[in-house]
Amino acid sequence: MFQDNPLLAQLKQQLHTQTPRVEGVVKGTEKGFGFLEVDGQKSYFIPPPQMKKVMHGDRIIATLHTDKDREIAEPETLVEPFLSRFVGRVQRKDDRLSIVPDHPLLRDAIQCRPVRELTHDFQSGDWAVAEMRRHPLKGDRGFNADLTAFITDGEDHFVPWWVTLARHNLEREAPVMVESALHDANLQREDLTALNFVTIDSASTEDMDDALQVQDNGDGSLLLTIAIADPTAYVDENSELDLIARKRAFTNYLPGFNIPMLPRDLSDNLCSLRPNERRPVLVCRVTIAADGTLGEDIHFSAAWVESKAKLVYDEVSDWLEGSGDWQPQNADIAEQITLLKRVCEARSHWREQHALVFKDRPDYRFLLGEKGEVLDIIVEHRRIANRIVEECMIAANVCAAIALRDNLGFGIYNVHTGFDPALVEQAANVLQANGVEADPQALLTLPGFCELRRHLDALPTQFLDSRIRRFQTFAEISTVPGPHFGLGLEAYATWTSPIRKYGDMVNHRLLKAIITGQQAEKPQDEITVQLAERRRLNRMAERDVGDWLYARYLQPMAGTDTRFPAEIIDVTRGGLRVRLLDNGAVAFIPAPFIHAVRDEMVCSQETGTVQIKGETVYSQSDKIEVRIAEVRMETRNVVARPVV
């Protein structure tokens, strides 16, 4: 009777139009209910039955209803699903398969089936790549996915590596070598094989791409020669290997092993500056004045060199510090090490005065067993030998930035513009509230930024430094010159790691064009997008594998009395994030572990402090002691508790 009633249809349409709607992102919880977050400002409750239609992270449009004075969101339309391609663990019951996504807030199994081309017989515990196919808000009965690739079985000790690489869609293997001969015969190379070049690396390094040699000019100045491996002598632009390297963009360094950008025969052999082997290189020569100033005589050329010694960071540092048993193999090598130390001291002094020097932070290295188990985590402090190489590489990259800018006006540049102009007022307010005079306009200039950084570095704690970091931009890759505020330099273009960075290979080709006087073509902007995206993915992969290994390493210590010194790196509404100083692991301290009465405590990201009854008890950058309360292996989260 009411079926074709136009009045009823009109009423329905009216109700539909009048029902308030909001667009937002679903936030799941471990308790079955969820919230719809709108513009990060307002959130609406989603009851458990309605959460069955959506997934954490989905962007949806929902209708709003009021139930017992509470506004409730009812999911209506899917705008953008959270999951498309994902990795997870397969469950098999009888002959039915489902997959649980590997994500902290996605606990429910999704029904799935392998695509036709996939012949693997999936078992419970297997890891797989999947693609979402069905979603309840698209009119489907439930969630459904296709299994598109088998990653490995659940018993594989190397699950952290294989799953992480699959998650970020990164290569597992080195590229395959194709027949490659030295081809740039028309490039005149000077013979520098008689000079005492040395390499300084870790003991295990095989892909040595830089060698150094210094000559004392006798007037307080030094002539530094930096020789860099020349893979573009073997890899033609747009050749098969070049396209592979362009796609990979970087060698991917993960705990325990690396996946090279170029075939190992090139990276670890033909191009590697091995001792007593004649190698083609690009060379930069520059005079360094007694005060560390780079001379105007920057000169690039192609050459042959022969490294006279493969030196190791710790051994060189020990020798310079007068400790350990190691000795240079002869007086020539000893002289080179001593001269390199002079280069380092002069350049470091110049950069402290005229640019910016990063504070030394330790590196953490996982010592792994044959089954991928973590035997130990070694803290590697940056010592004098590390600083020698760093200063020489920075000098070389400044020289390249100048040569490319003055001769071509383009290249692959690392650019960092300091404060975000939209946030600089807020940065100035935070500084002024903490007793540091700051003019927002001055902070946007390179001298103003450098002056502020030097002031912050001289303060007794890093509290203020960590507070204003969020108002700064990220470093970018650009095809035109621009300042690098983070280094305090007017221009910076890297060319010193062409075996492991594709952008450096591009700069090599441009430098060769300058050397030979040939026409050079400006790199396409698309290449900077690819480099930035790959750098992001590689960093995420390194972090993900690290989190997994930290969880494995710290799990036996959960619930014990073992104490760890830690630094507070972030304050959130829910608690504190800390870094364990002995091993580099990041842990979370939930607010209830800090103080039992929630109403008496304020955890403020705005001020970077935790206050109890109005008193500040913790601040960002504070050093505290913690115990490991729990390690959640399925999410690789470490939960800590402060030692009171």
Swiss-Prot record:
<keyword id="KW-0963">Cytoplasm</keyword>
<dbReference type="InterPro" id="IPR050180">
    <property type="entry name" value="RNR_Ribonuclease"/>
</dbReference>
<comment type="similarity">
    <text>Belongs to the RNR ribonuclease family. RNase II subfamily.</text>
</comment>
<dbReference type="GO" id="GO:0006402">
    <property type="term" value="P:mRNA catabolic process"/>
</dbReference>
<dbReference type="GO" id="GO:0005829">
    <property type="term" value="C:cytosol"/>
</dbReference>
<feature type="domain" description="RNB">
    <location>
        <begin position="189"/>
        <end position="516"/>
    </location>
</feature>
<dbReference type="GO" id="GO:0003723">
    <property type="term" value="F:RNA binding"/>
</dbReference>
<keyword id="KW-0269">Exonuclease</keyword>
<dbReference type="InterPro" id="IPR001900">
    <property type="entry name" value="RNase_II/R"/>
</dbReference>
<dbReference type="GO" id="GO:0008859">
    <property type="term" value="F:exoribonuclease II activity"/>
</dbReference>
<dbReference type="InterPro" id="IPR022966">
    <property type="entry name" value="RNase_II/R_CS"/>
</dbReference>
<dbReference type="Pfam" id="PF08206">
    <property type="entry name" value="OB_RNB"/>
</dbReference>
<dbReference type="InterPro" id="IPR012340">
    <property type="entry name" value="NA-bd_OB-fold"/>
</dbReference>
<comment type="function">
    <text>Involved in mRNA degradation. Hydrolyzes single-stranded polyribonucleotides processively in the 3' to 5' direction.</text>
</comment>
<dbReference type="Pfam" id="PF00575">
    <property type="entry name" value="S1"/>
</dbReference>
<protein>
    <recommendedName>
        <fullName>Exoribonuclease 2</fullName>
        <ecNumber>3.1.13.1</ecNumber>
    </recommendedName>
</protein>
<dbReference type="InterPro" id="IPR004476">
    <property type="entry name" value="RNase_II/RNase_R"/>
</dbReference>
<dbReference type="InterPro" id="IPR003029">
    <property type="entry name" value="S1_domain"/>
</dbReference>
<keyword id="KW-0694">RNA-binding</keyword>
<keyword id="KW-0378">Hydrolase</keyword>
<keyword id="KW-0540">Nuclease</keyword>
<dbReference type="InterPro" id="IPR011804">
    <property type="entry name" value="RNase_II"/>
</dbReference>
<dbReference type="InterPro" id="IPR013223">
    <property type="entry name" value="RNase_B_OB_dom"/>
</dbReference>
<feature type="domain" description="S1 motif">
    <location>
        <begin position="561"/>
        <end position="643"/>
    </location>
</feature>
<dbReference type="InterPro" id="IPR011129">
    <property type="entry name" value="CSD"/>
</dbReference>
<dbReference type="Pfam" id="PF00773">
    <property type="entry name" value="RNB"/>
</dbReference>
